[in-house]
Amino acid sequence: MLESLFGNPIIEKVLLFLLVNEKSYPSQLRRVFQNPLYSFQRALGRLEKGGVIVSHSEGKTLVYQFNPRYPFLSELKAFLQKAYAFLPQEIQEKYYESMIRKRPRRHGKPL
């Protein structure tokens, strides 16, 4: 829906996912959307370089969230909320509102 505006559908997915879930890491996005990991790493890098999102480390994992100092953050979130409202309900439930781990599992920890 917004890929023509953002230039790529992965960026749209990342921004909407961050809007709903507040934080994310690349392998979580890969698992949810079933796209290559590199696509998400590249999109997150572009957004971070533009100042839209920031990253911090939680253990060995780089976690991304919206940059609270981004000057157009409130406008961007309002725009994304409006776009999210137009998504079909099954897409909202499948990709954005499902039970998603908020922290990565320790490597090697049994399920």
Outline where the language-model segments fall.
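Short acidic, hydrophobic short linear motifs in intrinsically disordered regions
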Residues: S24-V32
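Short amphipathic alpha-helical interaction segments
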Residues: Q34-E48
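A generic structural signal for short
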Residues: E3, V14-L15, R31-V32
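Non-catalytic effector/regulatory segments
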Residues: F33, L47, H56-S57, I100-H107
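Amphipathic alpha-helical dimerization/coiled-coil segments
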Residues: P71-L111
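Glycine-centered, phosphate/nucleic-acid-interacting loop/turn motifs that mediate DNA/RNA or nucleotide
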Residues: G51
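Short amphipathic alpha-helical interface segments
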Residues: I10-E22
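Short, cationic-aromatic polyanion-contact patches
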Residues: L2-I11, Y25, V54-L80
